[in-house]
Amino acid sequence: MATEGLAGALATVLGGKGLLVQSCDSEPAGKPLLPVRLRKNVCYVVLAVFLNEQDEVLMIQEAKRECRGTWYLPAGRMEPGETIVEAMQREVKEEAGLLCEPVTLLSVEERGASWIRFVFLARPTGGVLKTSKNADSESLQAGWYPRVSLPTPLRAHDVVHLVELGAKFCQQATHPLILPQELPCNMVCQRLVATFTTVQSVWVLVGTVGTPHLPITACGFTPMEQRGGIKVAILRLLQECLTLHSLAVETKGLLGLQHLGRDHVDGICLNVLVTVAFRNPGIQDEPPKIRGENYFWWKVLEEDLQKQLLHRLQESSVVPLTR
């Protein structure tokens, strides 16, 4: 991929779109990566936040024995063969009785590569709100409740933060509307837009094996990588080409993600914005030195791409990636 190709790839990722994953630049040491399979070695969860014009939140009352009678947002596990959006729509229909469409991803939460939750802001498009007369094993009922007075008892208090995240986004969008892109991937991995900036310039880390490309790091399933979360895979790749003890690395968040749960391909690629900076910057006009020949710093000269990158960095205009 020449400079023109890199510019096109960066523009695609900044626009929330996806690129096919054909190989990865960094893998965990030891055993080869196993194919990712729902219900076997990964669990993906979907959750939806609905807010209406009366500042009310759609809540469902749980039917499961361990949390029966408590209240939560519509949520549940993805099933094999589903897209992420299809899973969210199915859970909302089963638990609340409503048809819906996603507005944007609000956040992505992870506990390592084996457990990832996708939080959507969504809007109803039809259906009939579930009442206690229609109680079943999915939920007892659903209802709209004032955002400042959610029904109790709550199944878990993380919903309070998620509702507020949705309300803030409705008041003022903190990132572009971003939805999962339907592209297959056979592993859980991250495509890095790893940046180094000075007052006037922006550099992006590029992998050189094969055609120059935005580097991809595979997430492992070892106990260490699970404990450390998916940021371990980012640090592993950067450690392979940079002297990290003199650098500060920050994961800003997601520019997008891609998944297509067809033909037993359950992997996910997260497109992640990362900053690399010197711990003691002083006057630094050049990015940190690269070790080896598998990577280089690409100086972004396209004015529009420069502006987009700087805006996304300065405003943290990304989907939060939390642990």
Curated annotation (Swiss-Prot):
Its cofactor is Mn(2+); Mg(2+). Residues 37-167 form the Nudix hydrolase domain. One of its GO terms (molecular function) is 8-oxo-dGDP phosphatase activity. Mediates the hydrolysis of oxidized nucleoside diphosphate derivatives. Hydrolyzes 8-oxo-7,8-dihydroguanine (8-oxo-Gua)-containing deoxyribo- and ribonucleoside diphosphates to the monophosphates. Hydrolyzes 8-oxo-dGDP and 8-oxo-GDP with the same efficiencies. Also hydrolyzes 8-OH-dADP and 2-OH-dADP. Exhibited no or minimal hydrolysis activity against 8-oxo-dGTP, 8-oxo-GTP, dGTP, GTP, dGDP and GDP. Probably removes oxidized guanine nucleotides from both the DNA and RNA precursor pools. It holds the Pfam family NUDIX. Keywords: Hydrolase, Magnesium, Manganese, Metal-binding, Nucleotide metabolism. A motif (Nudix box) lies at residues 76-97. Mg(2+) binds at L58. InterPro entries: Nudix_hydrolase, NUDIX_hydrolase-like_dom_sf, NUDIX_hydrolase_CS, NUDIX_hydrolase_dom, NUDT18_NUDIX. SUPFAM superfamilies: Nudix. It catalyses: 8-oxo-dGDP + H2O = 8-oxo-dGMP + phosphate + H(+); 8-oxo-dADP + H2O = 8-oxo-dAMP + phosphate + H(+); 2-oxo-dADP + H2O = 2-oxo-dAMP + phosphate + H(+); 8-oxo-GDP + H2O = 8-oxo-GMP + phosphate + H(+). One of its GO terms (biological process) is GDP catabolic process. It is an enzyme of class 3 (hydrolase). PANTHER family: 8-OXO-DGDP PHOSPHATASE NUDT18, MUTT/NUDIX HYDROLASE. The keyword Hydrolase applies. It comes from Rattus norvegicus (Rat). This is 8-oxo-dGDP phosphatase NUDT18. Its EC number is 3.6.1.58. Belongs to the Nudix hydrolase family.
